[in-house]
């Protein structure tokens, strides 16, 4: 069966660039039907592969949360977005005094309320004065920061917009939290992509940079900062919506490649995570929360075949390759193989050593690994001054690189040894048809952090 898979995949790769040719199109159709038949035999297309994900719920200790929120003013940035609006509609169920939404989108498709406690301020988090005035006027007690530019592909072609929104906009929010004496906690929505040890993809880099900003202010400021790491959000999934629409209206459905898997969660889980952070934030430490039980990842090709089968249209699937923002290869050393039964894509090995689990065993709590205040402050200063698309990406990535180097100097060296062993042993590289250089700058950075130590002797043979 595996050989048959590979033969079909290989042929689809060969034919995909020629999809406009009638003969190639017809053969792609036949190959797609063959794949659907194979997946059907395995019982993989009988229902939406994400059905169980949509139905999942997390524990939410409402009495304890209400004790925290009672009589408070909550400010939600991006409160007219998918997660933000759902959060607002959940907050009204608690005994809060007022909910302020700060959002630039005057034409949102999401609805909030109606509820007399909700007030909307239209403004952009990139505008420091708007942020300052909003905080000064409403004096929030709790800030939920969900506003962001969230499209990884868009981020690669709109670098300044993404960096100024995600990084400098977050900096505006954090600074406003510090100078507004009423603020007790600030909760930030991050991404599982920030668990990467290092990344050169713009969207993921901005979120990882932000996590370090919150870690910095948790140590220097007076406010408690917490975070959630979201994975693929089904309720506003760019991938899922594109596959569905193309299956209904286009003459083919494109997927990046076979063997590309995504973990996912729903907006109810997302909001429950953010509310749970209220109970797990600590002074001096930026904790993050993730869903513990994410289930097995779903293949994007499987989703495409499911939608084609569902529409009963005679159209093929094609492989389009990985676009910008989705090109980095998954590194096996990202996950903690000391306990294979507890693997989770949203937390890396260093962070996993600090993990705790809530009483209901459905949420993992950990914290980011600090780099050092001066390193982060220097990276922020450079990013605040830079202009231009190319220059902004260079400063973003170089700043993040220095932050990561600082982190590698502080972490347990044996953990770095374990990471390199789990990720770079030849038997694992052979399975992935990969080499160490495929994983980018993080590999030489890790080796460099071990040089001159006894730990280096344990891994030097892995350098190839």
Model segments located where?
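Mid/C-terminal beta-alpha module of Rossmann-like enzyme folds, strongest
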Residues: 280-375
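N-terminal Rossmann NAD(P)H-binding glycine-rich loop of SDR-like oxidoreductase domains
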Residues: 66-69, 73-94
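NAD(P)H-binding glycine-rich loop region in Rossmannoid oxidoreductase-like domains
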Residues: 125-164, 197-198
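Non-catalytic terminal and boundary segments that flank Rossmann-like NAD(P)-dependent oxidoreductase
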Residues: 1-73, 405-464
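Conserved glycine-rich Rossmann-like NAD(P)H-binding loop of the short-chain dehydrogenase/reductase
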Residues: 96-109
């Amino acid at each position: 069966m595996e050989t048959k898979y590979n033969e079909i995949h290989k042929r689809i790769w060969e034919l995909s660039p020629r999809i406009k040719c009638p003969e190639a199109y017809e053969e792609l159709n036949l190959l797609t039907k063959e794949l659907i038949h194979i997946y059907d035999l395995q019982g993989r297309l009988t229902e939406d592969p994400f059905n169980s994900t949509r139905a999942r719920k997390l524990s939410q200790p409402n009495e304890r949360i209400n004790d925290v929120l009672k009589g408070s003013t909550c400010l939600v940035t991006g409160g007219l977005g998918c997660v933000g609006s759902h959060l607002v509609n959940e907050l009204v169920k608690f005994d809060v005094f007022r909910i302020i939404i700060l959002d630039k989108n005057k034409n949102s498709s999401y609805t909030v309320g109606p509820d007399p406690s909700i007030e909307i301020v239209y403004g952009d988090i990139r505008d420091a004065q708007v942020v300052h005035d909003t905080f000064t006027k409403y004096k929030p007690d709790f800030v939920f920061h969900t506003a962001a530019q969230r499209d990884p592909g868009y981020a690669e072609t709109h670098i300044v917009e993404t960096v100024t929104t995600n990084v400098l906009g977050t900096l505006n929010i954090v600074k406003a939290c510090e100078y507004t004496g009423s603020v007790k906690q600030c909760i930030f929505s991050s991404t599982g992509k920030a668990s990467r040890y290092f990344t050169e993809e713009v969207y993921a880099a901005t979120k990882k940079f932000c996590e370090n900003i919150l870690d910095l202010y948790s140590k220097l400021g007076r406010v408690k900062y917490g975070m959630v790491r979201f994975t693929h959000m089904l309720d506003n999934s760019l991938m899922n919506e594109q596959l569905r629409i193309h299956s209904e209206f286009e003459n083919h459905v494109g997927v990046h490649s076979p063997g590309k898997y995504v973990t996912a969660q729903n907006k109810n889980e997302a909001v429950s995570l953010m509310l749970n952070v209220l109970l797990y934030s600590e002074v001096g430490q930026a904790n993050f929360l993730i869903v513990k039980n994410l289930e097995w990842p779903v293949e994007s090709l499987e989703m495409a075949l499911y939608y084609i089968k569902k529409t009963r249209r005679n159209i093929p699937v094609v492989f389009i390759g990985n676009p910008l923002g989705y090109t980095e290869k998954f590194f096996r050393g990202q996950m903690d193989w000391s306990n294979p039964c507890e693997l989770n894509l949203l937390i890396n090995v260093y962070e996993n050593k600090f993990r705790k689990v809530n009483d209901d065993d459905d949420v993992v709590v950990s914290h980011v690994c600090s780099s050092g205040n001066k390193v982060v402050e220097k990276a922020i200063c450079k990013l605040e001054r830079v202009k231009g698309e190319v220059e902004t990406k260079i400063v973003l990535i170089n700043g993040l690189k220095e932050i990561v180097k600082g982190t590698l100097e502080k972490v347990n060296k044996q953990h770095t040894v374990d990471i390199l062993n789990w990720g770079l042993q030849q038997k694992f590289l052979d399975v992935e048809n990969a080499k160490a250089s495929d994983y980018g700058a993080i590999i030489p950075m890790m080796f460099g952090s071990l040089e001159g130590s006894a730990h280096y002797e344990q891994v030097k043979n892995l350098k190839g």
